[in-house]
């Protein structure tokens, strides 16, 4: 059979490193995996207990609502009021998604079609590129990186784009670059969207992972933002529920309703016991994200300190669960994919090559803070030995 849409997909670069890691492990080599951003921290005991209780109730095994149960939508809007001072209507401005990734993908089907264009940061989380492409739209890349003014780059890309993009995709704190913005930036981008009649989609996956006094702003904190924007929030990192697949689309009521309508044709939502437990987690353990944040900060400090002792100076990120590291000068010519392969072979450490996040990621590797401090310390010792040996 001819799977034209599937056959058009390029090789998934990040899978190359995963394959090397698995091959090494089959040979008995202990590879420390800092490549895949797969949170290792468990959710709260209360959430797990509530899930177990809900699973035992026969009524909870029927189809759920694709929009999400009312109490869960109320819980997320209550969280936004407490956390960000944002008032949202749980009936019209909130829709539950099966994780932010599913929500974003289907949202692109709602907002874009053939002949449309979306502006996306480069580098970017892969679905931010492939979501618009799957919807039939074209991509306009906007350079994002150290010593880059993203807003100036966006203006330049806008002027060079015709037809004008219909959607701008944002995600701060940013994966993979860890770039952060303040509320003043959000105000500027909202003003731009109003002036140029473009719609904003903000993937707020790392809403609760800010360090050293930095508090990531919600785009919906800007007055009137819901006229031109929606935001995706997820429990994956904040509440350590990666495999539970609980996310939300929030903001513009017309767009939220459109996504809910599309989802009614595609799914029946997340398993209801998971929705019930997620509701309890947000309502009864509101400080849990602070505990998660503290763990990731300690891991960040351990990795940054260990890399420095290895002679690899990397700026400490203010947000996310990642470290975006420039390739050391002696290895720059290798490129990020070959350098990441070298780290697996010589240091027994897996990192994601920057090119896997688009051409704008070349010259960097991304480390995920998904191992405990002891394992991270061992990883940096391995890196130091390998880089010293290779000279």
Show which residues each predicted segment covers.
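Conserved core segment of the aminotransferase class I/II
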Residues: 221-222, 226-297, 301-310, 386-388
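Active-site phosphate-binding strand-loop segment of PLP-dependent enzymes
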Residues: 140, 144-213
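Helix C-cap/helix->beta junction micro-motif
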Residues: 24-27, 135, 195-196, 310, ...
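Conserved PLP-anchoring active-site segment centered on the Schiff-base-forming lysine
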Residues: 110-132
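Conserved glycine-rich beta-strand-loop-beta hairpin in the small C-terminal domain of fold type I
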Residues: 279, 296-304, 314-327, 361
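N-terminal small-domain helix-loop-helix segment of the aminotransferase-like
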Residues: 2-99, 106, 282-284, 389-391
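PLP-dependent enzyme catalytic core of the Aspartate aminotransferase-like
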Residues: 78, 82, 86, 332-335, ...
